[in-house]
Structure formats: C-alpha cells, structure tokens
Amino acid sequence: MFPQTTMDHILHPTPREGYYVVELNRSVWVVPNYYINLTPIGTGAYGTVCAAECTRSGTRVAIKKFNRPFQSIIHARRTYRELRLLRCMCHENIIDLLDVFTPNENVNDIEDVYFVSMLMGADLSNILKIQRLNDDHIQFLVYQILRGLKYIHSADIIHRDLKPSNIAVNEDCELKILDFGLARQTDSEMTGYVATRWYRAPEIMLNWMHYTQTVDVWSVGCILAELITGKTLFPGSDHIDQLTRIMSVTGTPDEEFLKKISSEEARNYIRNLPKMTRRDFKRLFAQATPQAIDLLEKMLHLDPDRRPTAKEAMEHEYLAAYHDETDEPIAEEMDLNDDVRADTIDEWKKIIWEEISDFQKNVAFADEEEDEEKMES
C-alpha cells in the first residue's frame, strides 16, 4: 500500500515551473499557466480536446492532448506527421496551429504532447444531430470543404480521414478541416487502413495498394449526402456490409472497373455478389436540388478515375454562388520531412522534441518582432 502522499504524487505529478495540473474526466492535464478554465469538449481515438482561455492573447482556444503519443512507433509517427503538416499549412479552411507544448522537461522524459488551435463553435457531427440545414448553408459548407481540399491536394497530400467530426464550424458558418494525423503525401503504394469506415472510399476497402486524392472527394460526397438527408449514407457495420451498402446505391461494377482492382480475391468476391442495379439519385435524394444531385452522382462514382478533383467539384454549378478562382489559393511548396524514419520510440521522441522546440523558437521570434513593431509605431 502506497502512503497517501506518494499516491497523490503519482496521480498528480509536480509540474515544471510555469505549468499547473488539472484533472479532467479522470485524465491528468499539465498545461502552461496562461491556459485557464479548461473544459472538456470532445474525445476521439487519438486524443481529447478541451476549450480554454488564453490569458496571453485574450482568446478562446482548443487544446488537444494526444492519447499515448509514444505508445508505439505508429502512434509517434502519426503525432509527428500531424505536427509537421499543421506547421506547414496556412489556409482559411484548415485549422491553424497556435501552440504546441510538452509539460515534460527533457527529451528522455517526454510522454505527453498538446496542440493548441483556435476554438471553433462546433463540428459538423454536432450540427447534424440538432438541426437540418437549408440548401444555401449546405452549398457554403461543401464549398469550403472543397476549397480546403484543393489547397491540401495541391501540396500532393491526401487527408484520408474526412468525416463530419473532423470538420469544425463556427457561428458564422465558417469552416475548418481538422485532424491531419492520417494525412500523408501521395506515393506509389498507399496503405489500405485509413478513415472512418462510413466515409471511406470503396477502392480503399477493395485493398488497392494505389489510390489517389479522389478518395477525399468520395468522403465529401458522403458528407454532402448526409447534410441533405440528415442521415449517414453508408452506415456499414463491417467492411463487407459497407461495400454491400455502397453497391446497393452505385450498382455492381462493370468488368472495366474490375480490371483496375489489383486484388484477385476482391475481384472474385465482387463477381460472386448478386447483381445490383444503380439507384436513382433523384429518388434517393428527393429533397435535393437537381444541381446537388448531379454533383453527388459525380463525387460518388464507384470508379475513382471518373470522380472530379476537388478543384473540378468546386467549379460545379451547384457551388456557382461561392466559386471564385481568384480566391481559391493553392499551397506553396512544403517541406514536410515525409522521409523521416525512426526505428525506436526514443528516436521518435527526439524528433518530436526537436520539432516542438523549433516551433516555440519561431513563435518567440515572431512575438519579439511584433513587440518591436509596436514600439516603433
């Protein structure tokens, strides 16, 4: 039996100078003193998010604490990938990284990583639970998703995990794409496991090793359908059920499409399925406008080669009220360090520690420049 004082120390470790400890939903958070009034607002597979006030800036922020970022090499790589991507990206429809910190005092002890971003009012999954949106709102939201995607894709990056809970919206209907932990640069052999199943493109489940940025466009199609109907389009209970639900809407693929599938097992499985005819989207989405239906048909095409790109989808007549090519920026060249490799947890700790240190140096330098400008003016 531990003495009570020892137990208290284990549950609530003594924080480093400038930090304090707070327990939230049975989880111990150790944060800088200038983040106050922490309130839990969400939990996911990879982290927990709290709202907080930043006394330095006088703004409300969201703080994300990663769940066991160094539990495995996969967890560590995911944390690094998201940190690197968010540092490189700068776009109105992509969440901004305001701060990143660890409460641990040296690289050997690093266990926790926290990201800080602007606090948004809600995410799309929250909104879908409480209200139905009119067509103008739907157009504006989908346009902003695609605007962010165009930027992401122009950097040769695939998000791979677009879903309502990864899309934040404020009270002015302004939208930001969240959670880049599964995002990665395109390569010749893309891994099969990504994304929440319900929004996952069929070519990923069909075990193709190579897929393209149009997997994200499929996800946007699923989100658009859900915004229109208020219901998840393909709520599969497992991979097989998911694929069956998709084909009950898109119809059984033809031989031309099947030839593109590299997995012989997947091809044979599909050939042995009962023939399904394509559903009439006008009946399936009876409440949608003809323009919305046309865009849905294009984005939810079973053949990824026949889906539009994010840029092409933005140019669709359904989004004509918002499309403005002069205000749809693409990314500058990004140094994502995507070739960084580490074989041990300790090596990943060193890489992430250095990334956090570099971020904080750049923020401190920017703050100094801002102070100098204020003094000069």
UniProtKB/Swiss-Prot annotation:
**Which residues get modified to Phosphotyrosine?**
Y193
Organs and tissues of expression: Expressed in intestinal cells.
Q: Does the keyword ATP-binding apply?
A: yes
Which metal ions or organic cofactors does this protein require, according to UniProt? Mg(2+); Mn(2+)
> Catalytic activity annotated for this protein?
L-seryl-[protein] + ATP = O-phospho-L-seryl-[protein] + ADP + H(+); L-threonyl-[protein] + ATP = O-phospho-L-threonyl-[protein] + ADP + H(+)
Activity regulation description: Activated by phosphorylation on threonine and tyrosine. Inhibited by pyridinyl-imidazole related compounds.
Please give the coiled-coil regions recorded for this protein. Answer: none
Assembly and oligomerization: Interacts with transcription factor atf-7; perhaps in a manner dependent on dual specificity protein kinase sek-1.
The UniProt family comment states:
Belongs to the protein kinase superfamily. CMGC Ser/Thr protein kinase family. MAP kinase subfamily.
Protein known as: Mitogen-activated protein kinase pmk-1
Q: What's the gene?
A: pmk-1
